[in-house]
Amino acid sequence: MSDGYHLWSERYDRELKDIFDVQDEITLAVVEALKVKLMGETKSAVLRRYTDDAEVYELYLKGRYYFNKYTPEGWMKALEFFEQAIQKEPEYALAYAGKARALTSCSYHGLLSYREIVPAWKAAISRALELDQNLVEAHIAQASFYFYHEWNWEAAEREYRKAIELNPNNSDAHQLYGTFLASRNRFDQAISEVRKAFELDPLSLHARFNAGFIFWFDNRLDEATSQVQKMIELEPKSRRGAKRFAGIHGA
């Protein structure tokens, strides 16, 4: 399979007494099926549990779901769910990292002012790293803030690379690093990173969206069109996909 979607399938019939045990079992089964070799800290990062509270975990997942819609309403909704998770479990590192990243998106897209989000962002990212200095999501959140708000290219690249070093199998880190590299006119490296993101997560809408941007910016219009078409196939109602397609073709 060069660019398809069916990599692995299996049926699981389990009593959902402990969703986290089932999650670990499925994760390891996928790793084995795809012949991914997880070593030391990478394996620990993949399997680490940051909460044993299913309700808190559900709030976090809802935050991730809405964040990944990449819409103004989605980012604001994500912020609410991450905050709810923190209120229920103040030691939940992932929720702080999610909050920090959602704040960055809300500010970058004009939903909240930069001045308004900075104290909350600093508090959230500081707490996330205090709870786990090797939290991949926290380093991604830092990188995004340095990139989009501080324009501190050196710090942004350092944090993206740190996230990938901590977990080379994190699709999000690769595709976001690819976008950063494209902004610095390092297109060959950028394309390598987004291709890695596809290998890890062929269904990632955001990776396809960013790949379309990278290819378009490098004047590779056929490849840009192909990536956006794949995005639209995955999510036919995607407004972002339609807008990016129109932008590529000057509509």
How would you name each of these model-derived features?
Residues 1-251:
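Acidic, proline/glycine-rich low-complexity intrinsically disordered segments
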